[in-house]
UniProtKB/Swiss-Prot annotation:
GO cellular component, as recorded: outer membrane-bounded periplasmic space
Major localization listed first in the record, in broad terms: periplasm
Compartment annotation: Periplasm
Keyword Signal: yes
Tagged with keyword Transport: yes
Leader sequence segment: 1-23
Gene from which the chain derives: lolA
Keywords (A to Z) from UniProt: Chaperone, Periplasm, Protein transport, Signal, Transport
Function (record text): Participates in the translocation of lipoproteins from the inner membrane to the outer membrane. Only forms a complex with a lipoprotein if the residue after the N-terminal Cys is not an aspartate (The Asp acts as a targeting signal to indicate that the lipoprotein should stay in the inner membrane).
Protein name: Outer-membrane lipoprotein carrier protein
GO biological process, one term: lipoprotein localization to outer membrane
Length: 207
């Protein structure tokens, strides 16, 4: 649930070459993000507290499509489903038989999932961006320019031009690490993947 809400609200062994935040870093990150109009992958997510103690570990699958469409399904036993049709987000909790529906916040600092599925053409207006590169791996660190966010730092890592993992760090040092596997880019995804059908008998909360 924590990962879902952060997405909503939102050490390499090689010697890395640091790159100062400049227009080249911004342009490179924007290009890498925008070249994938669709993405599908499995993910594994690990949450650690500020001292490094494991708090939660989950797995699941995701599908993304620009602009602003995503389907993020966490496996049982902590099953959750988050679906965006580009205008609203539906969060389904099968254990509670409850769906929460809210308007999609288009701000990248409030909805990190949009970094992979939304409009990132003005990403530098929301974040200070720095990059480090080693071989075929590029790490981008994004720090929000405003304090009204659910995370203090976000790292996106690309391997051979494809998203490999991401990490979010909140104000108390809690880390959420997400590793993507079996990533497929720019393949057709059924439109129904981004339409949530409310189950019969479910409690519905509109926010």
């Amino acid at each position: 649930m924590r990962l879902i809400r952060m997405l909503l609200a939102t050490a390499l062994t090689f010697s890395m070459i640091p790159a100062h935040a400049d227009s080249k870093d911004v342009a490179r990150l924007t290009q890498l993000l925008e070249k994938s109009q669709t993405l599908t992958a499995r993910f594994s997510q690990l949450t650690l507290d500020g001292g490094g103690t494991q708090l939660q570990e989950t797995t699941g699958e995701m599908a993304l499509q620009r602009p602003g469409l995503f389907n993020w399904h966490t496996d049982a036993p902590q099953e959750q489903l988050m679906v965006s049709d580009g205008k609203k987000v539906s969060l389904w909790d099968p254990d509670l038989e409850q769906v929460t529906i809210k308007k999609l916040d288009q701000r990248l600092t409030q909805t990190p999932a949009l970094l992979l599925s939304g409009d990132v053409s003005k990403i530098s207006e929301s974040f200070d961006i720095t990059a480090k590169e080693a071989g075929g791996v590029i790490d981008f660190t994004l720090k929000p320019k405003t304090k009204d966010t659910l995370f203090d730092s976000l790292r996106l890592s690309f391997r051979n031009g494809i998203i490999n993992d991401m990490q979010l760090i909140d104000s108390v040092g809690q880390r959420t690490n997400i590793l993507f596997t079996g990533v497929k880019a720019n393949e057709s995804i059924a439109a129904s993947k981004f339409q949530f059908q409310i189950p019969k008998g479910a409690d519905v909360i509109q926010e």
